[in-house]
């Protein structure tokens, strides 16, 4: 394991110019301190480092991870130029059922990108997810599901990683 700055410096030597990170695991462990650590560590890095504000800390209401990161905790970051929007909204039931706490977070980033995380929602739920304000998704692993997401107006991120070809 390396520090965020070490990772960015090494990757920059090989041509990576920009990172967009969702530090939800750092927030799960240490809340705002985890986000501040990443922002501070990468402030003077040789590549651009941007953050998507973690939307689901904990991931769902039944998780017990030690930290809660609410809309009130996010508010100080809203005007930070390196915070681009709201990170992957994993709690799709909170979006679909219009839970107030989720919509307060989404409203903080209303005119910015709101990243999704919607693995195989049925059509009606997928439509509600998009209509609520989610802009993107990276969970489509089949052409058919990606097409359904595009038809509903979501921008599909092509997923390339160790689990992308399972």
For the regions a protein language model found, what residue spans apply to each?
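Acidic-and-aromatic substrate-binding clefts and catalytic sites of carbohydrate-active enzymes
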Residues: 2, 27-29, 163-164
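Active-site core of metal-dependent hydrolases
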Residues: 88-166
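Divalent-metal coordination cores built from histidine and acidic residues
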Residues: 8-113, 154
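Di-metal (Zn2+ and/or Mg2+/Mn2+) metal-binding site signature of metallo-dependent hydrolases
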Residues: 1-8
């Amino acid at each position: 394991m390396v520090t965020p700055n070490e990772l960015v410096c090494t990757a920059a030597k090989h041509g990576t110019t920009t990172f967009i990170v969702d530090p939800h695991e750092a927030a799960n462990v240490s809340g705002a301190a985890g986000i501040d650590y990443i922002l501070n560590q990468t402030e003077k890095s040789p590549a651009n480092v941007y953050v998507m504000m973690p939307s689901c800390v904990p991931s769902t209401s039944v998780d017990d991870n030690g930290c809660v990161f609410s809309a009130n905790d996010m508010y100080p970051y809203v005007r930070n130029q390196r915070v681009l929007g709201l990170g992957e909204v994993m709690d799709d039931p909170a979006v679909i059922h219009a839970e107030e706490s989720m919509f307060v977070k989404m409203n903080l980033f209303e005119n910015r990108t709101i990243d999704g995380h919607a693995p195989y929602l049925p059509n009606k739920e997928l439509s509600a997810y998009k209509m609520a304000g989610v802009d993107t998704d990276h969970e489509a692993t089949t052409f058919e599901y990606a097409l359904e997401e595009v038809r509903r107006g979501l921008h599909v991120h092509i997923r390339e990683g160790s689990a992308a070809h399972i």
